[in-house]
């Protein structure tokens, strides 16, 4: 590494020390090195893929801004890990065409081979694969709907990767709704609407993410309507993703609701525990990590909301183990993760019914006074879940369970809360109950 690269790296680190907290700097930058600095391109090497991903998601723009401030002009930034993963992060733009680059947003890790299929995403996966193989035939548009971190973006980009592998010259455009809007604003400002329209309306496959953010943007909706029509009439494939159904997006034009719903709307739900474990196992395999089964079970049981949260927990655990030098055990990672139980909007009737079903008891058993161990245990779990996932007071929960005193409710909640931290079987039971309650509550 020449002296100019060393000097730039030194200056960059000194600036980052001033901008970041000490723990953040030491955790994410202290082990990084500069690998290359030439032809206005800076390549930074992270210690492992987890740090690489964190830098990409959280410090990309900061690095680019600081480097530009140091050298006086925009610089291309690349991140790499010691294992060889490379992600092109930041490329300076000088014209509208460069800002409208069609494929540089695709994450190389978002492909079909790395997507874990389970019962909650099987239809969406099958539809995405069909679209990738024969775009513009069936399911046009394909509308992927689901909560945050459930794999919509992964599937969209997998379509792009698959098509580009078969036909490298395909014009595959992946953009967020925000980027589409920003490109539109730039085109208006630069008086280059013709260039904007030529770009988007000549796509072979248009992948638009986070469509819910089109809400309230009348001019963006107008321009997107005509873009959609042009592509659809030409037999080109459009794939859309949103955290809600078309008709649930506020102030979305009726004509757009109609067009977005004319193909296939594929819903993606939170993964079940078996799928969550498979996701963790596959990620560990790709990252060359050896994870004990009990660690995988612990994370899968305690993180149930979405895949992003699940993988985030794995990253925190492995980063902590890497830094601390401790063995990978549940006991060592539990204090770092400290997973919260996700609160849900539900009713006491649903909780009572789910608990009774799980333990093969009747509602009368739960509300009665039997001290049989299995009934008492189920009753305590029911009280705990009702306390955690409803707004009922302690006396009101006691009434739901046949008029029990509020001190009995307190004892039950405390006992389950303490026991779950040492009992992995109880953790799994609670996770299964919450999944079932979630499912029934969504269908109320």
From Swiss-Prot:
Localisation: Cytoplasm
Q: Which UniProt keywords apply?
A: ATP-binding, Cytoplasm, DNA replication, DNA-binding, Lipid-binding, Nucleotide-binding
Q: Which GO terms describe its molecular function?
A: ATP binding; ATP hydrolysis activity; DNA replication origin binding; lipid binding
Q: Which InterPro entries match?
A: AAA+_ATPase, Chromosome_initiator_DnaA, Chromosome_initiator_DnaA-like, Chromosome_initiator_DnaA_CS, DnaA_C, DnaA_dom, DnaA_N_dom, DnaA_N_sf
Per UniProt, ATP binds at 149, 151-153
Q: Which GO terms describe its cellular component?
A: cytoplasm; plasma membrane
Pfam families, per this entry?
Bac_DnaA, Bac_DnaA_C, DnaA_N
GO terms for biological process, alphabetical = DNA replication initiation; regulation of DNA replication
- Positions of region (Domain IV, binds dsDNA): 322-444
Positions of the region Domain III, AAA+ region?
105-321
Q: What residue spans carry the region label Domain II?
A: 73-104
In residue numbers, the region (Domain I, interacts with DnaA modulators) covers 1-73
Q: Name the source's superkingdom.
A: Bacteria
Report the function annotation for this chain. Plays an essential role in the initiation and regulation of chromosomal replication. ATP-DnaA binds to the origin of replication (oriC) to initiate formation of the DNA replication initiation complex once per cell cycle. Binds the DnaA box (a 9 base pair repeat at the origin) and separates the double-stranded (ds)DNA. Forms a right-handed helical filament on oriC DNA; dsDNA binds to the exterior of the filament while single-stranded (ss)DNA is stabiized in the filament's interior.
Report the family membership.
Belongs to the DnaA family.
- Which HAMAP family does the record cross-reference, listed alphabetically? DnaA_bact
Free-text comment on this protein's domains from its UniProt entry: Domain I is involved in oligomerization and binding regulators, domain II is flexibile and of varying length in different bacteria, domain III forms the AAA+ region, while domain IV binds dsDNA.
Q: Relate the assembly described in the record.
A: Oligomerizes as a right-handed, spiral filament on DNA at oriC.
* Protein name as catalogued: Chromosomal replication initiator protein DnaA
Q: Which source organism?
A: Microcystis aeruginosa (strain NIES-843 / IAM M-2473)
Give the gene that encodes this protein: dnaA
